[in-house]
Amino acid sequence: MEIKRFLHGGEETYRCLALDVSPRLAVLLFPHPGERRAGGFLFPAGSRTYGFFWARRHYLLYVLHGPDGGLIAHRFDVVDEVRLGPGRVEYLDLALDVWVDPSGRAWTEDEDEVVELFSQGLLSPQRLSLIERTQRLLLARHRRIAAEAGDELRRLGQMHGNVG
């Protein structure tokens, strides 16, 4: 189970399958039985998302694949307070997302939400600085992080070939 907590106090829970959970990293699988859209991408029915949640990193990664196994996109979420445990992954969402298309083009989403959270006093100056540092890191190193995720999926026997 993925538990996504928000700075305003709410939370969302997502059902998933744990492929591997260690004190360092949890890898989860989210099947998508129905079609959906996000980040300007279409995810056909039968698509799947692999989630990578690191205990000591301020981001998580979703690797999104179509029903044919082809890469649709990568999405990184800036997060804090990641907790990995048996049957659950929990974290605090810090609003900013970085999307990367299969060509490697990267862009950020929800910067306006970050500004609004800061102006409402829900985001401390320290966390704002953390978001900015993590954004720079993700824009500079998304290819390396995606390759690391691909290696992990191959180790788990979930993929053959390139993860993107």
Residue ranges of predicted features:
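A hydrophobic, small-residue-rich beta->alpha segment in the mid-to-C-terminal subdomain
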Residues: 94-139
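A short, polar/proline- and glycine-enriched secondary-structure boundary/capping micro-motif
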Residues: 37-42, 86-87, 117-121
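A long amphipathic alpha-helix within ATP-dependent nucleotide-binding catalytic cores
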Residues: 76-79, 83, 90, 130-146
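Cysteine/selenocysteine-centered motifs that mediate thiol-based redox chemistry or coordinate metal-sulfur cofactors
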Residues: 134-164
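Short acidic-glycine loop/turn motifs at beta-strand connectors
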Residues: 21-23, 67-68, 101-103
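Phosphate/ribose-recognition catalytic cores of enzymes acting on nucleotide-derived substrates
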Residues: 42-83, 89-96
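Charge-rich, low-complexity N-terminal segments
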Residues: 1-48
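Hydrophobic residues embedded in beta-strands of well-ordered beta-sheets
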Residues: 25-26, 71, 106
